[in-house]
Curated annotation (Swiss-Prot):
The keyword Cell wall biogenesis/degradation applies. Its main location: cytoplasm. HAMAP family: MurC. It comes from Pseudomonas putida (strain W619). This is UDP-N-acetylmuramate--L-alanine ligase. The gene is murC. Its EC number is 6.3.2.8. One of its GO terms (molecular function) is ATP binding.
């Protein structure tokens, strides 16, 4: 049965009163900071610039510093850092000199989870959407979960929230193997793909073993929820010595989807569960990859005793996550308009899934992609895959690689990608010079009825709102909030 609402014992971290976040504006950091603020801790943080995220935290009482300086950390009882922070950072150096503990963000998340019934969502792709769906369904089921998500949940207007129930739903980050800090009661593995391989010394077997180790952080009475459609997840399944539930499209899955149909943004399917009546479900998200995300959610909600009615309501009422196939609106062009979509996908598997979703939901429309590769190392490691999947667009514009702190790698840049895609003979990509304005470049290429997709994890994320405001697209119609 679903638990009733009750006051949740809050974590007490002994002598810790003031918590300082180095890089507080980061998507993985700000959510934890917001939860800690709501728990009554003093929170400070530094970042390189003011942003809506830092302004939001400041409005909740956080002290925000612009720039990294030693004095920012002077009064902290603990520093929280992400893997993106250089160990030579002056705030980190000061903390170490003064014997102030410096902990990774995942360790702080683990501390919050230690006092709760933790649900941790891991996997190379789909973490943010699955975590968000879980938050929506748990809320619909009468629970009030705490959640920490790697994207802005549209309905809540934030990526984190302190709830009153015993549940904490959070993403588990494999990029730096920090998810090994977490000790959840329930863990999801959506898929395992080659990404962040520097963390695993280029050894895919090491990556797989780390996922198994993560699942063994579950207690013997916990639950591992695993996608049977993913070949690598299927491969590691026999090694997992914890209770498991599988999901997918395949017949062997404990929870599976059949009769999938998609029209535009809406996807409908039937869910089969062992010893349960079939469940008819609709989600306002395109693509089979989102069906899988919904199945993981249904598996956990069913196990936690949430009613079928609440599951259906939570999924159908889900309003999406920022930059996960986010429809911004319609851009006017000669003879009609173009649907403008923003998406965070930055791995070939994610790009392919979105292209497939567009082809399934809007089969008669052209797809124009503005893509920005993220990191030179990822571009190098997955070069052939990028060439193949990006070549499936109808029109392709490539921005220069977003370095994310990396130095350029010869042959792993967007000019070379353009050349390789052009050699395939399917289309002629357009290279966008760094700093060039997009609107004058893209407008002549658009036709009425097109879908314009701005995709990637770098500063490409700012293009969609810029296009909506561009004088060249005067009269653009903003997508209405659901």
């Amino acid at each position: 049965m679903v638990e009733s609402q009750k006051a949740m014992p809050q974590p007490k971290m002994g002598r810790i009163h003031r918590i300082h976040f180095v890089g507080i504006g980061g998507v993985g950091m700000c959510g934890i900071a917001e939860v800690l603020l709501n728990l009554g801790y003093e929170v400070s943080g530094s970042d390189l610039k003011v942003s809506p995220v830092t302004q939001r935290l400041e409005s909740f009482g956080a002290e925000i510093f612009v720039g990294h300086r030693a004095e920012n950390a002077a009064h902290a009882d603990v520093l929280v850092v992400s893997s993106a922070i250089n160990p030579a950072n002056p705030e980190v150096a000061t903390a170490l000199e003064r014997r102030i503990p410096v902990v990774p963000r995942a360790e702080m998340l683990a501390e919050l989870m230690r006092y709760r019934h933790g649900v941790a969502v891991a996997g190379t792709h789909g973490k943010t959407t699955t975590t968000s769906l879980l938050a929506s369904v748990f809320a619909a089921g009468g629970l009030d979960p705490t959640f920490v998500i790697g994207g802005r949940l549209t309905a809540a207007g934030t990526n984190a929230q302190l709830g009153t129930s015993r549940y904490l739903i959070a993403e588990a980050d494999e990029s730096d193997a920090s998810f090994l800090h977490l000790q959840p009661m329930v863990a999801v593995v959506t898929n395992i793909d080659a990404d962040h391989m520097a963390t695993y010394e280029g050894d895919f077997n090491k990556l797989k073993k780390t996922f198994v180790e993560f699942l063994h952080n579950l207690p013997f009475y916990g639950l591992a929820v695993m996608c049977l459609d993913d070949p690598v997840v299927r491969e590691i399944l026999p090694q997992v010595k914890r209770p498991t539930v599988t999901y997918g499209f395949c017949e062997e899955a404990d929870i599976r989807a059949i009769n999938v149909s998609q029209k535009g943004m809406q996807t409908h399917f039937t869910v089969l569960r062992r010893d349960r009546e079939p469940l008819e479900v609709s989600v306002n998200m395109p693509g089979n990859h989102n069906v899988l995300n919904a199945l993981a959610t249904i598996a956990i909600a069913t196990d936690e005793g949430i009613s079928d009615e609440a599951i259906v309501q939570g999924l159908s009422g889900f309003q999406g996550v920022g930059r996960r196939f986010q429809v911004y609106g319609e851009l006017p062009v000669e003879g009609g308009s173009v649907m403008l979509v923003d998406d965070y996908g930055h791995h070939p598997t994610e790009v392919a899934a979105v292209i497939k979703a567009v082809r399934g939901g809007w089969p008669s429309r052209r797809l124009v992609i503005v893509y920005q590769p993220h990191r030179y190392s990822r571009t190098r490691d997955l070069y052939d895959d990028f060439v193949q999947v990006l070549g499936d667009a109808n029109v392709l514009l490539l921005m220069e690689v977003y370095p994310a702190g990396e130095e350029p790698i010869p042959g792993a840049d967007s000019r070379q990608l353009c050349h390789s895609i052009r050699q395939r003979g399917k289309l002629d990509p357009i290279y966008i010079e760094r700093g060039a304005e997009l609107a004058p470049l893209v407008k002549p290429l658009l036709r009425a009825g097109d879908i314009l997709l701005c995709q990637g994890a770098g500063d490409v994320g700012g293009l969609a709102p810029q296009l909506m405001k561009s004088p060249l697209f005067a009269g653009a119609k903003q997508e209405k909030s659901k």
